Amino acid sequence: MSAPAPSPLAIVDAEPLPRQEEVLTDAALAFVAELLHRRFTRAVTNSSPRRADAAREIARTSTLDFLPETAAVRADDSWRVAGPAALNDRRVEITGPTDRKMTINALNSGAKVWLADFEEPSAPTWENVVLGQVNLSDAYTRNIDFTDERTGKTYALRPLKSWRPSSWPRGWHLNERHLVDPDGSFGARRVVVDFGLYFFHNAQRLLDLGKGPYFYLPKTESHLEARLWNDVFVFAQDYVGIPQGTVRATVLIETITAAYEMEEILYELRDHASGLNAGRWDYLFSIVKNFPATRPKFVLPDRNVTMTKLTMTAFMRRYTNCSSYCHNARASAAIGGMAAFIPSRDAEVNKVAFEKVRADKDREANDGFDGSWVAHPDLVPIAMESFDRCWHRPNQKDRLREDVHVEAADLIAVDSLEATTYAGSSSTAVQVGIRYIEAWLRGLGRVAIFNLMEDAATAEISRSQIWQWINAGVEFEHGEKATPIWPRKSRRGRKWRPVREELGEEPFAARDWQHAHDLVVQVSLDEDYADFLTLPAYERLRG
């Protein structure tokens, strides 16, 4: 006797949205329920204690090493991943949220890959979750346009040449409060909601277009989590009746533990892997999260100094070079970091910023990366030129980087950054965190702050540095010490005058700065480090 059909998940505490019936069908919700409850609940539940155990061991020993039990996988030169021809050229990938305007602009940008991101640049309101899925389906059927109510400007798709979409679901650690088990017992994991709805509605549609269901996998911490993803892919392909090996996934190496298991992660996903991405900012955030603030060698310097010098330090060069070597030795794509600059009306500002973007992309191309990220369409030709100038072909997977030799200690050598922490920048860290969270609580996940397109990673690194500096007792350049006092006074007086001038008095007064301030201060001053700022923020998010 065949197993009974799974019951679909129930929608709770959510106002009806236009066209939600196209996405939240009984069949799609039954697929998500099957993924979550009947197949992978135990594996997902077991992953949390494993993460906690690993974190405690790192805190105890203040070190990490490559796994001895997987040495055979690393030593075996015979295996490769099965990267598809459809993702052979990834020289420039544009990332952004799944709203209609960004969807159209990304597909019109000329980038080789569009990364439709449900995670960091998207505040997880129910409207963003559901209508993001609607927008992607409309894009793939070329049934999408948008008119900006404020400016009257109309956006429409131009004839598309070579483009490949890749979806970025939210992480395993998050629950979706609006979709629950039929008995109301617990909520669905957001990652299963994002992946499940997208895959169910678009896998066959994308194959019919000569593309495929491609994904970015965030917040992966170990090869065991990669194994879980592989099991999900196998089940999902069988469920909807498409061939095994159709799915392709790029894993973000944005946690310190994953950096020590890059080859093992590729091995577990070898039938579905297309590459790894060097998530530089989240990598640093993960170091703060895992290593004791009482150890001076792990204290990160000023964020602005780090922004300028980060990619040139021996520490980060070893991380990115290790990524490049690992990717290309296994025939997978090596994708570099984000260029987050937003073009300004000031030509001189643009000139300086474009040169920094060009230098960063030149370095990545010369280091062996096959492509890189940008956040704005105007940066696509700049990044493309860097990779075209370095090598005149779709990728450089044949460049094995046999010159790269990385020791375990190199990947956590934060003290090699050799930079100072400045008191003024500590205030900037607080302001950036508050400005981002204020927008996030209004449903915006991607925000322009100081000429950069910032997302959740910005808020995480900002509040992490505040927490770390206070707990480490950092002294700033003039001898002032980091204490709990300065985050609390960050909203007072002249420091917010530029924001008032930028927004105007009425819009500034209309926004809920106090809630954002209180939340950033709370997670910055808590004795125990909160795993993710967005977890307590989600409790305050409306919608």
From Swiss-Prot:
GO cellular component: cytoplasm
Keywords, ordered alphabetically: Cytoplasm, Glyoxylate bypass, Transferase, Tricarboxylic acid cycle
Keyword Cytoplasm carried by entry: yes
Entry's Gene Ontology BP terms: glyoxylate cycle; tricarboxylic acid cycle
Subcellular location: Cytoplasm
Subcellular location, principal: cytoplasm
Main enzyme class: transferase
Entry-linked InterPro entries: Malate_synth_C_sf (IPR044856), Malate_synth_sf (IPR011076), Malate_synthA (IPR006252), Malate_synthase_CS (IPR019830), Malate_synthase_TIM (IPR001465), MS_C (IPR048355), MS_N (IPR048356), MS_N_TIM-barrel_dom (IPR046363)
Pathway: Carbohydrate metabolism; glyoxylate cycle; (S)-malate from isocitrate: step 2/2
GO molecular function, one term: malate synthase activity
E.C. designation(s): 2.3.3.9
Domain of life the protein comes from: Bacteria
Catalytic activity from the UniProt record: glyoxylate + acetyl-CoA + H2O = (S)-malate + CoA + H(+)
Similarity comment text for this entry: Belongs to the malate synthase family.
PANTHER family reported for this sequence: MALATE SYNTHASE, MALATE SYNTHASE 1-RELATED
Protein's name in the database: Malate synthase
Organism from which the protein derives: Streptomyces arenae
